[in-house]
């Protein structure tokens, strides 16, 4: 199978689904950790602007991750659709939590870097730049909305721009690593066939 051809549903082996399951466990742990830190620490800036929205977004993220643990076991819906829904939900929930925490100074925007890298590697790089563009649009919209709604908020478009560039850099790196991995895997299969015959 050439590197540029599409992957059919039958090509998604247990390894793909196991990677998606571990990625979802990471998502569950991050969401749970954010909730625990926001409940236990009175010094955390998490939810500093709108704590109730932060809690709802965090609980929604954890529940959504828990639901997908079951759906991954059932393998419903398909692999690409599950991955896309999970990453887009990460972007949506983290954007809400970022807004509820007072914007970019909370540091929550960096969490999407890990999510984008993981998704890029799991998808074998095919959707990585798409996810980075969605995250960038969401970040810029969140920053603009924060400027309009939070009193005395200083827009940090330069920081948002740098973080957006980091999103694309991580997505591109994941894309390149995934292509390299696929090429190595294909070469190993060819050499395995050569040794057998």
Show the residue positions of the predicted features.
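Alpha-helical transmembrane segments and their interfaces in multipass membrane proteins
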Residues: 32-59, 74-85, 102-105, 122-180
């Amino acid at each position: 199978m050439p590197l540029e051809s599409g992957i059919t549903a039958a090509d998604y082996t247990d390894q793909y689904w196991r990677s998606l399951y571990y990625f979802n466990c990471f998502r569950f742990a991050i969401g749970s950790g954010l909730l625990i830190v926001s409940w236990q620490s009175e010094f955390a800036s998490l939810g500093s602007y709108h704590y109730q929205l932060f809690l709802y977004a965090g609980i929604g993220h954890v529940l959504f991750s828990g639901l997908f643990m079951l759906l991954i076991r059932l393998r419903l819906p398909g692999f690409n659709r599950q991955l896309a829904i999970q990453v887009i939900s990460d972007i949506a929930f983290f954007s809400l939590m970022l807004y509820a925490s007072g914007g970019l100074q909370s540091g929550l925007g960096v969490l999407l870097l890990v999510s984008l890298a993981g998704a890029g590697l799991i998808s074998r790089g095919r959707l990585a730049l798409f996810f980075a563009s969605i995250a960038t649009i969401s970040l810029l919209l969140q920053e603009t909305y924060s400027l309009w709604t939070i009193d005395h908020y200083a827009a940090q478009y330069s920081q948002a721009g740098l973080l957006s560039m980091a999103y694309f850099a991580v997505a591109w790196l994941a894309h390149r690593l995934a292509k390299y991995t696929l090429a190595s895997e294909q070469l190993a299969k060819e050499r395995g066939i050569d040794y057998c015959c």
